[in-house]
From Swiss-Prot:
Alphabetized UniProt keyword annotations: Cytoplasm, Fatty acid biosynthesis, Fatty acid metabolism, Lipid biosynthesis, Lipid metabolism, Phosphopantetheine, Phosphoprotein
Role played: Carrier of the growing fatty acid chain in fatty acid biosynthesis.
Subcellular location field: Cytoplasm
NCBIfam families assigned: acyl_carrier (TIGR00517), PRK00982.1-2 (NF002148), PRK00982.1-3 (NF002149), PRK00982.1-4 (NF002150), PRK00982.1-5 (NF002151)
Main location as per UniProt: cytoplasm
Cross-referenced SUPFAM superfamilies: ACP-like
GO molecular function: acyl binding; acyl carrier activity
Gene that specifies this protein: acpP
PANTHER family, sorted: ACYL CARRIER PROTEIN, CARRIER DOMAIN-CONTAINING PROTEIN
Protein name: Acyl carrier protein
Organism of provenance: Synechocystis sp. (strain ATCC 27184 / PCC 6803 / Kazusa)
Organismal lineage: Bacteria, Bacillati, Cyanobacteriota, Cyanophyceae, Synechococcales
């Protein structure tokens, strides 16, 4: 896992979800572990798209349920 991408994703997750940075691990799930609801998830995807200048289609966004999966998707772009 690219550490630089992970750190950027972590920063965005902490800002968007207002969670403790220590809780943001590659295995942390957005809904269960970090308390994101559906609106939080949409806003998080939009923030990631803007930060990394990518587009994440809705059908892909629905499968990204952990911090690690978000990083992997961004790495693949």
């Amino acid at each position: 896992m690219n550490q630089e991408i992970f750190e950027k994703v972590k920063k965005i997750v902490v800002e968007q979800l207002e969670v403790d940075p220590d809780k943001v691990t590659p295995d942390a799930t957005f809904a269960e572990d970090l308390g994101a609801d559906s609106l939080d998830t949409v806003e998080l995807v939009m923030a990631l798209e803007e930060e990394f200048d990518i587009e994440i289609p809705d059908e892909v966004a629905e499968t990204i349920d952990t911090v690690g999966k978000a990083v992997e998707h961004i790495e693949s772009k």
